[in-house]
Amino acid sequence: ATKKEENVQDIAQTVNAVSGSTLDDYQIRDLSELAQVVSGVEFTKIDPRRATIIMRGQKLDPDGGNDQPIQGYIDEVPLRAQDVFSQMYDTERVEILKGSQGTLQGVVSTAGAIQIYTRSAQVGSGEKNGYVKTMWADNMTSMVEAASDLHLSDTLSLRVAGLRNTSDGNEIRNIRTHVNESHNFDSGRISLSWQPSDELSVRFKYQNSETDSIYPQPVAGSNGTPSYEQVVNGYVAEIALYESLGFAPAGSAAQLAYLNRPTYGDIPAGGLKASDGVALHFQNPRQNNSAEIHNLMIDYDMGSHALALRFSDSQNDAMGLIDRDYAGAYVYGYPQEVRTNTGIETFEMRISNQDSDKLEYTIGFFSRNSQTFTTADLDRSFSITEVAPQLYKPAVGFDYKTPNQACNAARAAPGSMAAKSWVLTC
């Protein structure tokens, strides 16, 4: 929190520090699971696209257009919420800093900051500090994590770490596209440490990661009374009448009948329950995040003062596709795709005195240059709106609902096989 080694009890601010061993003991893989060991902070992963953090009554919301009150970091690099919420591995510790943060943390954040520190290569030690860790659980969940140090010389060491995680989530089935829920995360990290003297330490880290999730949106309910087919039949007859009178384009009734009449013959007579985990839409909601992080850290002990320099460059490409037609009322669905490309470059310099126990001070400079480009594609394709815009809303107003959280909660009951892990160290 203060950018130097101190006892948490000696720091004049609210700090929760979670060690890597605690993360391993509780099998904590991402921020949404940190609530097991940290109080006063709420982590919520709404879906693969959105995640929020609430700290001291203020919320970090990636969809918000304003400056965020909570900033997340990995190895002192400020990142977007999607990157911070990615799965943690080979982690040294996590610090939760509550309250306004400024000079010492880089980006000004009014509610707090979250610092994730990964393990660095150890110089001057012959130990590999390596391990291979595997885990299996319900719903086709598997994880393989490995890391090890490679000692190149007495002053130069390299650490390599990687993770692969796959899961079928809550096993939601899309009976229209026959594509079921799946989540995949792959990441690799290289850490290079050079320590030519006791006074100078140089560390460089590169991380590449990709998250890919297909998450059908389950629905619950029935065809309603009247059924959707009866409603569409009525619209077809009405459009045919308008067409015969010249008030609608030729072929409108046929287009409506073809494009907007799913049979729903594959739905049980009693409808769908939340616990069924069934989706009906014709597109496959998908979230894909790919990120690269370059980070250079230089620390120099000048005797009475300590100099710290930080350079970072991070790139993120996020693609989100959703189908707004959850109930499958349109043959081609109602897809909406949003792609966001973000590049962030930062430079930070800090000079701290270390020659006085009575007066401590830090002089810092922080610069951030970020660019974000967002493109959105909203495609109704061949929909009813082309022939009868006024009928769009009532056409999907039957009794199917989209209690996504309720459906997922109903499917997320404790499984018969809890997570089983194996660890091999060297």
Model-derived features: positions:
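Acidic, small-polar-rich N-terminal luminal/periplasmic segments of exported/outer-membrane proteins
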Residues: 1-123
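Outer-membrane beta-barrel pore domains and translocons
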Residues: 2, 58, 133-139, 163-165, ...
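Short acidic-glycine motifs
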Residues: 60, 107, 126, 159, ...
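Outer-membrane beta-barrel translocator/receptor signature
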Residues: 68-69, 89-92, 98, 103-173, ...
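Extracytoplasmic loops and strand-loop junctions of Gram-negative outer membrane beta-barrel proteins
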Residues: 96-97, 128-131, 171-176, 275-282, ...
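Signature of Gram-negative outer-membrane beta-barrel scaffolds
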Residues: 174-180, 204, 354-426
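Outer-membrane beta-barrel domain signature, strongest for Gram-negative TonB-dependent receptors
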Residues: 177, 183-362, 368-370, 404, ...
